Regions:
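Membrane topogenic/interface segments and analogous intrinsically disordered interaction regions
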Residues: 1-243
Length: 243
């Protein structure tokens, strides 16, 4: 039977199967990650030289669960995207399917680049500045929960925000926006990005500044990408008219 002729019940059955496959994959990766949670913990805390403290035995378990969940989410993400794509692809036109598929690898790559940038550059820089403010005045003792929350708050938002160029490129390719619109609303976009940085990061000026700078650069990169795509579309249209 053709996919377009499937009933609602059959669609729901297929959706259930794909969702179950993703959940099982997540659970398996989670269990494996839990076995290596101590190594993951050492890797995540490599930028902090002191021993982190815990306030109770339950904290250790929750820390391991959070780390395993993060690993499972990151590793399972491509598999999840594959099932989403397989589910919606038959309902799309060939041009729409081609346009969306072209951005899937770029989207995942930008997510990983955002994670790496946040973890290796933004988090250590913010941590060094903030700890330096209290040097000689305070004895710094961070709990593992506090530290991991700090790392997640400065890393995961950047991973999501690094999707901005991909989103802008996709919207430009389907004609919803163009570089002129992005340039015209640049000042408002900067303000929104600043507010977004304040919301997503810990409540201090250094974190806000460290988050805002890459956001602005990403927005400018998005404008450049949008210009390139628009020029390519216009060139293709001119060539089509000539033929």
């Amino acid at each position: 039977m053709d996919r377009k002729e499937l009933t609602i019940v059959e669609h729901l059955v297929e959706f259930r199967k794909r969702l179950l496959a993703v959940v099982i994959c997540f659970f398996l990766v989670f269990c494996v990650s839990l076995l290596f949670a101590d190594q993951i913990y050492q890797y995540v805390t490599q930028f902090f030289q002191q021993k982190l403290i815990v306030l109770g035995p339950n904290d250790i378990l929750w820390i391991y669960i959070r780390l395993a969940s993060l690993m499972a989410f990151t590793i399972t993400l491509p598999y999840t995207v594959y099932h989403i794509w397989s589910f919606i692809k038959p309902g799309l036109k060939k041009e729409e399917a081609r346009a969306i598929f072209a951005y899937i690898p770029a989207s995942f790559l930008c997510f990983l680049v955002g994670l790496a940038f946040g973890f290796y550059f933004v988090t250590p820089a913010i941590l060094q500045v903030l700890l330096g403010l209290g040097e000689g005045l305070f004895e710094t003792q961070l709990t593992a929960q506090n530290y991991l929350s700090f790392v997640f708050q400065t890393t995961l938002p950047l991973a999501l925000i690094f999707e901005l160029p991909v989103i802008i490129a996709f919207l430009t390719s389907i004609g919803l926006i163009g570089p002129e619109l992005l340039i015209a609303y640049r000042r408002y976009a900067y303000f929104i990005l600043l507010v977004l940085a304040v919301i997503l990061t810990p409540a201090d000026f250094v974190s806000d500044l460290a988050m805002t700078a890459p956001l602005i650069l990403l927005y400018e990169l998005s404008i450049a990408i949008s210009k390139h795509i628009m020029k390519r579309k216009q060139k293709g249209a001119r060539n089509g008219n000539l033929t």
